[in-house]
């Protein structure tokens, strides 16, 4: 999530609303002015609180840059420290604007660890939004609507973590219906793809993929899992090869899954086909993989797959 860009859009849209009639050309001029110095256009508690969150997340991300150089104890100490700082920043933002939904979301994600407890907490936050416009009336193009969409996307991912697959699919599709025209900025189709795989709904996965011109690590892995679960092994083998070929280090990500930090507040914007995307897809699919007997062993039994994983580890000096 780009907090600064969204702050710019929020400030510009609010100023446009205050000024009344404004042509598109005039709005573009306003947008350029706000982009130069967005802080100068902050004139509401909602914007001030959101700005505080942006500053906090920038510090949070900067503090994690050297994590790879730390041993386990040092890493946990540094992680605990930055999460504590983030929780404090969320509380500060809420003291400015108690209705700041992004602060509520971030605070909950940074505080509640157990997926079942997290799901309850997120659903409780969403219930408080019931008196606002109906969810299907939201618009990603309106920056003030995005917080509710992020919240619903977080609920969908947490449903998947809890193995509540029907609810995960329903909530993911509700987000996708609103955001698909904007290119699915929250990656709702990724959660939906995994849900279709777990529910063994090939028709649903086919229809989902047909809506987009390009697949990704999630859809490739979902396809492979689905075919394996349906015992269509030759087709599953071809899908596994596609997953490995389309995503850097995908075989290594599968064979040596690593810790993936909680998404704050939404899934990072990975470069298509990068190793980080493959890691995230495997991480999000762990609940399905654990519930699919012998899947990892079957992957490992493909000699080319293990060779790919080993070669990637050697090339990038990773543990094997």
Positions of PLM-derived features:
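TPR/TPR-like (Sel1-like) alpha-helical repeat modules
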Residues: 119-130, 176-178, 210-217, 227-252
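Residue-level recognition of tetratricopeptide repeat
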Residues: 48, 86, 96-103, 182-185, ...
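Flexible helix-coil transition and linker loops at the boundaries of alpha-helical arrays
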Residues: 38-43, 90-97, 121-145, 177-185
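Long, ordered, amphipathic alpha-helical scaffolds
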Residues: 59, 225-320
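Extreme N-terminal leader/anchor segments
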Residues: 1-88, 92-95, 240-243, 306-320
């Amino acid at each position: 999530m780009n907090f600064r860009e969204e702050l710019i859009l929020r400030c510009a849209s609010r100023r446009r609303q205050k000024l009344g009639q404004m042509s598109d050309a005039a709005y573009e001029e306003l947008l350029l002015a706000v982009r130069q110095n967005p802080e100068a256009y902050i004139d509401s508690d909602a914007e001030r609180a959101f700005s505080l969150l942006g500053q906090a997340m920038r510090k949070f991300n900067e503090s994690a840059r050297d994590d790879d150089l730390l041993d386990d104890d040092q890493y946990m100490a540094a992680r605990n420290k930055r999460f504590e700082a983030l929780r404090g920043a969320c509380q500060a933002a809420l003291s400015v604007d108690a209705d700041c939904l992004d602060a509520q979301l971030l605070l909950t994600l940074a505080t509640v660890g157990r997926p079942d407890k997290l799901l309850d907490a997120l659903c409780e936050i969403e219930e408080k939004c019931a008196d606002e416009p109906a969810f299907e009336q939201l618009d990603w193009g309106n920056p003030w609507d995005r917080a509710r969409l992020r919240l619903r996307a977080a609920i969908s991912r947490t449903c998947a973590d809890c193995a509540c697959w029907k609810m995960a699919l329903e909530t993911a599709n509700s987000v996708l219906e609103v955001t698909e025209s904007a290119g699915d900025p929250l990656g709702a189709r990724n959660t939906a793809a995994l849900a279709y795989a777990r529910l063994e709904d090939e028709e649903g996965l086919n229809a989902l993929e047909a809506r987009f011109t390009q697949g990704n690590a999630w859809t490739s892995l979902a396809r492979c899992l689905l075919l394996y679960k349906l015992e269509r092994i030759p087709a599953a083998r071809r899908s596994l090869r596609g997953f490995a070929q389309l995503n850097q280090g995908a075989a290594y990500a599968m064979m040596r899954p690593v810790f993936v930090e909680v998404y704050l507040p939404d899934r990072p914007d990975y470069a298509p086909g990068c190793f980080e995307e493959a890691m995230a897809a495997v991480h999000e699919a762990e609940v399905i993989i654990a519930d699919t007997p012998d899947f990892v062993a079957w992957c490992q039994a493909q000699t080319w797959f293990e060779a790919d994983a080993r070669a990637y580890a050697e090339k990038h000096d990773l543990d094997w």
